[in-house]
C-alpha cells in the first residue's frame, strides 16, 4: 500500500503520529510519503496545493489527513484551495461519516441510547461547486446567489453506494432531503432512490425531511441505519450525529472515490485546535478510527476490524481519565 500522509496544521501532526503507529502495527510495511501542506506551506511559498503535489497524490492508494486550519490564514483559503480542491480533483463523491456510540462513551442524550448508523453524504455537488455570484456588492441592492447543482449521474452513484452499505448492514436506508420545498432537486433524489431500490428488494426505504431528521437523530437515533443525503444537508447532520455519539473528537470520516480511480482520503473530523497544539494532550482516537475506515476501504478487512475493536475496548475502559496523546496511542496499541 502506498499512503500519502498530510499531517497538516495544529494538532494534526500529533494525532497522525499515533494513527500511523497503529497502522504500522496492523499492516507493517506500508510505503508512506509525507506532504507538508497547510498554513506553513502557504506562508513560506504563497501556494496551497501545487499542481505537482496534486499529481503525486494521485499516484498513491490512499491519503491520511490530520487537520487543516490556522488563525493566521485568510478565511476560506485552505478550505477551498486545499480540502475542496482535493475533493473535486480526486472525485471524492462519497463523504462517509459513521455515527456510533461506543460503550463507555457518554452521549448528551438521556439514557445513552444504542446508536449505530452511517451517513453517506454526496461530496462533489450541491451548493459547494462554486456556482453562484454576487452583484452590486456593498450596496443596499446587493444580490448574492449560491446555486445547488444536482446531476442524475452524481446522485445515482451516491445512492447506489448507500444501498450497497445498507445491504451489508441492517438493510434500512433513509433519504434525507427537503423535497416539499426544494422540489426539483428533491424530486431527482427521490426518483433515484426509488429506481435503485428496485435492485435491492431486501432494503427497506424511508424518507425524512431534513428538519424532521434532526429531531429524530436526537429523540430516536436508533431508527437510522444508512442515511443518504446531499452535500449541504449532509454537512449539517453529520456534525449533529457526531455530537450525539459523544462529540466531534471521536468522529472519523472518509472522502471516497467509489470507483477506485483516485485515492480516497481519510481524516478525523475535528479541527486543528491551535490552542492546544504542541502540548501533547490532543486525543488521537478519531485519527485512529480514520485508519480503520481507510483499511476497510482498501479491503484490509481483518486489520480494520482489529483497529475498531481495539478502539472500542479502549473507550469502554477509559472513563474520565485524562490521557496524553501518546498515552491514548499506547492504550489502543495495547488492545490490538
Swiss-Prot record:
Q: What class of enzyme is it?
A: oxidoreductase
Name the domain of life.
Answer: Bacteria
Q: How is the cofactor bound?
A: Binds 1 Mg(2+) or Mn(2+) ion per subunit.
Gene Ontology CC, one term: cytoplasm
Q: Which residues bind Mg(2+)?
A: 211, 235, 239
Q: Name one Pfam family in it.
A: Iso_dh
Q: Which cofactors does this gene product need?
A: Mg(2+); Mn(2+)
The positions annotated for binding NAD(+) are 271-283
**Which GO-annotated molecular functions does the record name?**
3-isopropylmalate dehydrogenase activity; magnesium ion binding; NAD binding
Family statement:
Belongs to the isocitrate and isopropylmalate dehydrogenases family. LeuB type 2 subfamily.
Protein name (record): 3-isopropylmalate dehydrogenase
Name the chemical reaction catalysed here. Answer: (2R,3S)-3-isopropylmalate + NAD(+) = 4-methyl-2-oxopentanoate + CO2 + NADH
Q: Which HAMAP family match?
A: LeuB_type2 (MF_01035)
Q: In which pathway does it act?
A: Amino-acid biosynthesis; L-leucine biosynthesis; L-leucine from 3-methyl-2-oxobutanoate: step 3/4
What's the EC number here? 1.1.1.85
Swiss-Prot/TrEMBL keywords: Amino-acid biosynthesis, Branched-chain amino acid biosynthesis, Cytoplasm, Leucine biosynthesis, Magnesium, Manganese, Metal-binding, NAD, Oxidoreductase
Q: Where in the cell does this protein reside?
A: Cytoplasm
Which Gene3D superfamilies does the protein's record reference? Isopropylmalate Dehydrogenase
Assembly, per entry: Homodimer.
Q: What does this protein do?
A: Catalyzes the oxidation of 3-carboxy-2-hydroxy-4-methylpentanoate (3-isopropylmalate) to 3-carboxy-4-methyl-2-oxopentanoate. The product decarboxylates to 4-methyl-2 oxopentanoate.
Sites annotated Important for catalysis? 128, 178
What organism is this sequence from? Answer: Mycolicibacterium gilvum (strain PYR-GCK)
Instruction: Give the GO biological process terms.
Output: L-leucine biosynthetic process
Indicate which residues the UniProt annotation says bind substrate.
87, 97, 121, 211
Amino acid at each position: 500500500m502506498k499512503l500519502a500522509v498530510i499531517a497538516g496544521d495544529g494538532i494534526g501532526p500529533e494525532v497522525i503520529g499515533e494513527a500511523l503507529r497503529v497502522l504500522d502495527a496492523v499492516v507493517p510495511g506500508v510505503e508512506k510519503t509525507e506532504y507538508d501542506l497547510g498554513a506553513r506551506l502557504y506562508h513560506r511559498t504563497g501556494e496551497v496545493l501545487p499542481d505537482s503535489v496534486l499529481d503525486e497524490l494521485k499516484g498513491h492508494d490512499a491519503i491520511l489527513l490530520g487537520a487543516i486550519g490556522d488563525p493566521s490564514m485568510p478565511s476560506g483559503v485552505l478550505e477551498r484551495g486545499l480540502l475542496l480542491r482535493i475533493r473535486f480533483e480526486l472525485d471524492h463523491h462519497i463523504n462517509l461519516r459513521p455515527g456510533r456510540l461506543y460503550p463507555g462513551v457518554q452521549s448528551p442524550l438521556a439514557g445513552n441510547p444504542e446508536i449505530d448508523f452511517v451517513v453517506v453524504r454526496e461530496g462533489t455537488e450541491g451548493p459547494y461547486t462554486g456556482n453562484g455570484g454576487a452583484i452590486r456588492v456593498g450596496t443596499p441592492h446587493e444580490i448574492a446567489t449560491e446555486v445547488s447543482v444536482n446531476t442524475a449521474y452524481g446522485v445515482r452513484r451516491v445512492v447506489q453506494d448507500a444501498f450497497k452499505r445498507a445491504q451489508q448492514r441492517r438493510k434500512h436506508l433513509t433519504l434525507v432531503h427537503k423535497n416539499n420545498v426544494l422540489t426539483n432537486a428533491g424530486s431527482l433524489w427521490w426518483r433515484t432512490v426509488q429506481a435503485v431500490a428496485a435492485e435491492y428488494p431486501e432494503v427497506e426505504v424511508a424518507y425524512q425531511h431534513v428538519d424532521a431528521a434532526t429531531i429524530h437523530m436526537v429523540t430516536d437515533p436508533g431508527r437510522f441505519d444508512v442515511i443518504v443525503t446531499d452535500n449541504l444537508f449532509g454537512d449539517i447532520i453529520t456534525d449533529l450525529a457526531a455530537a450525539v455519539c459523544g462529540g466531534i473528537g471521536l468522529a472519523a470520516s472518509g472522502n471516497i472515490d467509489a470507483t477506485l480511480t483516485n485515492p480516497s482520503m481519510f481524516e478525523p473530523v475535528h479541527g486543528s485546535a491551535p490552542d492546544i497544539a504542541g502540548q501533547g494532550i490532543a486525543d488521537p482516537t478519531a485519527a485512529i478510527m480514520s485508519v480503520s475506515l481507510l483499511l476497510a476501504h482498501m479491503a484490509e478487512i481483518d486489520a480494520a476490524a482489529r483497529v475498531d475493536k481495539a478502539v472500542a475496548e479502549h473507550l469502554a475502559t477509559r472513563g474520565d481519565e485524562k490521557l496524553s496523546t501518546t498515552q491514548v496511542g499506547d492504550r489502543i496499541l495495547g488492545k490490538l
